[in-house]
UniProtKB/Swiss-Prot annotation:
Coiled coil: none annotated. Keywords: ATP-binding, Chaperone, Metal-binding, Nucleotide-binding, Zinc. This is ATP-dependent Clp protease ATP-binding subunit ClpX. ATP binds at residues 120-127. The keyword ATP-binding applies. Zn(2+) binds at residues 13, 16, 35, 38. One of its GO terms (molecular function) is protein dimerization activity. GO terms for biological process: cell division; proteolysis involved in protein catabolic process.
């Protein structure tokens, strides 16, 4: 900083008009002067604007109890999993907000905790992750691990997962960097059993290795148009440090691994009461999966290490599926009731009909995921005929409508009036 002494007359600040005598210092530039008071004022304005921006970037995170309360409106059952996920998500976004403040804190650095969700097909893994993103109002993307291969082989690069998130954030990189990515079928990239084959495992262990960096946190180069990367292509850089990764899979056969670990071969002498209790309770084996079981299943240690939070979903029973059909905020039965109401027709499902649909889903081993196709099959002919009729006031779905494709019971308008 320097004072101008070469100009004729008193030097004044170009911004406030004060002279040298009225301020401590005046800084000169090409044809312009600024005093120390205006410099301080400019700094205050910039700091205030920066703090406002930081505040805007801070996510409003509901408490774990509030997250579970909202999840209960959409997801039936899975109480333990919902509690685990709500705490994990709450802590993750507390960490994100703390990092956004950029405070000079000498305390411990909070590390990211990604989540692994184990559960049978149709138990709600994807829907839970999707619901969490909706509650937090952050971008969300779903990826299928079976489509991924390591770089240089036919298939998708792992960076394409980030592209989906970026697209769902409308190419807003800052929003994408705070999103949630759910990678499904993660059990399908377990490394193959040791054998004499010299073929490289490009869709198993190779993909696990390729995912390590983005799970942990790295600056990834994402091709904006997708596809394979090539040297002439421009990239969008995404920092994955604050992206929450949730991976899920059915892990068929892992119950056997848990059972062996808990002492399946020591029935009677040597088996403690806790082991016997677990072994006698079927589905509860899933609740006792530990990282060592995932290692034996075929996930590599480095990959497991980046998924410190592990939770399991129980297989849905008949009662759960009936509740899923009727209770959630956007339950399928409520959706079809609304569809028919738009044609001024009431829709009623007899309780026994709902149970038959639940039994069908269990028989097909599709869980909650298969309920939509079942109810769509039941309703298809009804929804085809009804718009052409003006005499129907109410449709009643019976068990026979579900099991035998029998005609539903119709209540006509003149019958209802009488």
């Amino acid at each position: 900083m320097f004072e101008n002494t070469e100009t004729e007359g008193p030097v004044t600040c170009s911004f406030c008009g004060k002279t040298q005598d009225q301020v401590q210092k005046i800084v000169a530039g090409p044809g312009v002067y600024i005093c120390n008071e205006c410099i301080d004022l400019c700094k205050e304005i910039i700091d205030e604007e920066f703090n406002q921006t930081a505040a805007q970037e801070t996510l409003e995170v509901p408490t774990p109890a509030d997250i579970v309360k909202t999840l209960n409106q959409y997801v039936i059952g899975q109480t333990e999993a919902k509690r685990t996920l709500s705490v994990a998500v709450y802590n993750h976004y507390k960490r994100v907000n703390e990092m956004a403040q950029e405070t000079d804190d000498d305390g411990p650095e909070l590390q990211k905790s990604n989540i692994a969700v184990i559960g049978p097909t149709g138990s709600g893994k994807t829907y839970l992750a999707q619901s969490l993103a909706k509650i937090l109002n952050v971008p969300f993307a779903i990826a299928d691990a079976t489509t991924l291969t390591e770089a240089g082989y036919v298939g998708e690069d792992v960076e394409n997962i980030l592209l989906k998130l970026l697209q769902n954030a409308d190419y807003d990189v800052d929003r994408a960097e705070k999103g949630i990515i759910y990678i499904d079928e993660i059990d399908k990239i377990a490394k193959k059993a040791e054998n004499v084959s010299i073929t490289r495992d490009v869709s198993g262990e190779g993909v696990q290795q390729a995912l390590l960096k983005i799970l942990e946190g790295t600056i990834a180069n994402v091709p904006p148009q997708g596809g394979r990367k090539h040297p002439q292509q421009e990239f969008i850089q995404i920092d994955t440090t604050n992206i929450l990764f949730i991976v899920g899979g059915a892990f068929d056969g892992i119950e056997g691994i848990v059972k062996r670990r808990l002492g399946d071969q020591t029935i009677g002498f040597g088996a403690d009461s806790q082991e016997q209790h677990v072994l006698s309770s079927g589905d509860s084996l899933m609740q006792h999966v530990i990282p060592e079981d995932l290692l034996e299943f075929g996930l590599i240690p480095e990959f497991i290490g980046r998924l410190p939070i592990l939770t399991a979903l129980e297989k849905l029973d008949e009662n759960d599926l009936v509740r899923i059909l009727t209770e959630p905020k956007n339950a399928l039965v409520k959706q079809y009731e609304k569809l028919l109401a738009l044609d001024n027709v009431d829709l009623q499902f007899q309780p026994a009909a709902l149970r038959e649909m639940a039994k069908l889903a269990i028989a097909r081993n599709t869980g909650a995921r298969g309920l939509r196709s079942i109810i769509e099959d039941v309703m298809r002919d009804i929804m085809f005929d009804l718009p052409s009729r003006t005499d129907v006031a109410k449709v009643v779905i019976t068990p026979e409508t579900v099991t035998e494709h029998a005609e539903p019971e119709l209540v006509l308008k003149d019958q209802k009036a009488s």
